From Swiss-Prot:
Hexamer formed by 3 homodimers. One of its GO terms (molecular function) is nicotinate-nucleotide diphosphorylase (carboxylating) activity. The gene is nadC. Keywords: Glycosyltransferase, Pyridine nucleotide biosynthesis, Transferase. This is Probable nicotinate-nucleotide pyrophosphorylase [carboxylating]. GO terms for biological process: NAD biosynthetic process; quinolinate catabolic process. It comes from Synechocystis sp. (strain ATCC 27184 / PCC 6803 / Kazusa). InterPro entries: Aldolase_TIM, NadC, NadC/ModD, Nicotinate_pribotase-like_C, Quinolinate_PRibosylTase_N_sf, Quinolinate_PRibosylTrfase_C, Quinolinate_PRibosylTrfase_N. It is an enzyme of class 2 (transferase). It catalyses: nicotinate beta-D-ribonucleotide + CO2 + diphosphate = quinolinate + 5-phospho-alpha-D-ribose 1-diphosphate + 2 H(+). Disulfide bonds: none annotated. SUPFAM superfamilies: Nicotinate/Quinolinate PRTase C-terminal domain-like, Nicotinate/Quinolinate PRTase N-terminal domain-like. Involved in the catabolism of quinolinic acid (QA). Pathway: Cofactor biosynthesis; NAD(+) biosynthesis; nicotinate D-ribonucleotide from quinolinate: step 1/1. Pfam families: QRPTase_C (PF01729), QRPTase_N (PF02749). The lineage of its organism: Bacteria, Bacillati, Cyanobacteriota, Cyanophyceae, Synechococcales.
Length: 295
C-alpha cells in the first residue's frame, strides 16, 4: 500500500519576509563597506542622483526586489522602479530598473546589489534553458540541495523563477535513501523497512538506484519515488518500463550527468522528473551594469 505523501508545503515561489532577509542584506553591506566607502565619501557625493540598471546580455531576471531593499537600507528615501518583473526574460540593452536618491548610497550599494541580482539571474537563466529543452515532454525539471550554504532559499527562489520545481528545501521535507544510506543499512530493503518503523510521521520515501537489480528491489519496497542515478538512456528506459508495469503510482526521477545535450534523450525515456544541480552550481552570472544618469 502506498503511504501518505508529505512533501515540501512551501516551494520558493516568493521571497521570505524582509524581517528574515534584512539581516542578510545588512551583513553583506557591512562586509563590503568595512570601515567606510572612502571612494564615495572622499568625493563628497551626498547630493541626489539617478541611475539605471542595464542588461548587457539576454537572460532571465531574478532578485530585483532585494536590490531595491539594499539601496533603501542605505537611503530610506531611495526611489527604485523595477522595469523587469521577476522571472521575465530580457534582451541585451534592456533597462531593467531605475533608481533615484542619495548618490553616495547608489555608489556604495552598487556592488552588493549587482552581485546578488547577477548571481540569481544567472541561475534563473540557465534553469529556463533546461526547462525549455524538455517543454515538449511531460517531464518536470527539478533542482537539488547542492546550494551555497546560507543562500539556499534565494538560489531555489531563482530556480523557481526559471521554471524548475524545487526538490527538498531541507532534509526534513522528505526521505531520500542514497547510496551511502543503503551501504550503511545493508540493503535497500533493510533501509526502507527501518525507516518506516522509525519515522515520526508519514513522509515520502525516495530510493536512489544505479542498476536494474536495485530498481527491482526498490519496486518491491513500494516507495513513492525511485531515482535512476547515472544510468544510460537504454537502461533507464528499461527501468521505467519495469516500474510502470509493477506500480504506475511510483514516480520516477532521473539524475546524474544531466546536461542540456542529453536532456531530451532522458525525457524521452518517460521519467517523471529530471534533477540537476547544474543551473545552481555552474551557471554564469548574468551581466548587468549600473549607469549613473547625469542631469
Amino acid at each position: 500500500m502506498m503511504r501518505i505523501l508529505v512533501t515540501n508545503p512551501a516551494p520558493m515561489t516568493c521571497l521570505p519576509p524582509w524581517i528574515i532577509i534584512d539581516p542578510w542584506l545588512q551583513q553583506w553591506l557591512a562586509e563590503d563597506i568595512g570601515r567606510g566607502d572612502w571612494s564615495t565619501q572622499g568625493l563628497g557625493l551626498q547630493h541626489r542622483g539617478q541611475a539605471r540598471w542595464v542588461a548587457k546580455e539576454n537572460g532571465v531576471i531574478a532578485g530585483l526586489p532585494m536590490a531595491a531593499r539594499i539601496f533603501q537600507l542605505l537611503d530610506p528615501s531611495m526611489e527604485f522602479q523595477v522595469l523587469a518583473g521577476e522571472g521575465q526574460a530580457v534582451t541585451a540593452s534592456t533597462v531593467v530598473a531605475t533608481m533615484a536618491g542619495n548618490l553616495g548610497s547608489l555608489l556604495t550599494g552598487e556592488r552588493v546589489a549587482l552581485n546578488l541580482v547577477m548571481g540569481l539571474s544567472g541561475i534563473a537563466t540557465m534553469t529556463r534553458q533546461y526547462v525549455q529543452a524538455i517543454a515538449d515532454y511531460p517531464t518536470r525539471f527539478v533542482d537539488t540541495r547542492k546550494t551555497t550554504p546560507g543562500l539556499r532559499v534565494l538560489e531555489k527562489y531563482a530556480s523557481r523563477l526559471g521554471g524548475a520545481m524545487n526538490h527538498r528545501l531541507g532534509l526534513d521535507d522528505a526521505v531520500m535513501v542514497k547510496d551511502n544510506h543503503i551501504q550503511a543499512a545493508g540493503s535497500i530493503t533493510k533501509a526502507v523497512q527501518t525507516l518506516r518503523q522509525n519515522l515520526p510521521y508519514p513522509l515520502a520515501i525516495e530510493v536512489e538506484t544505479s542498476n536494474l537489480e536495485e530498481v527491482q528491489e526498490a519496486i518491491a519496497t513500494q516507495v513513492e519515488i525511485i531515482m535512476l542515478d547515472n544510468m544510460g538512456t537504454d537502461t533507464m528506459a528499461t527501468a521505467v518500463k519495469l516500474i510502470r508495469q509493477a506500480n504506475p503510482l511510483i514516480r520516477i526521477e532521473a539524475s546524474g550527468n544531466v546536461t542540456l545535450a542529453n536532456l531530451t534523450a532522458i525525457a524521452s525515456t518517460g521519467v517523471d522528473f529530471i534533477s540537476s544541480s547544474a543551473p545552481i552550481t555552474r551557471s554564469p552570472w548574468l551581466d548587468l551594469s549600473m549607469q549613473i544618469v547625469r542631469n
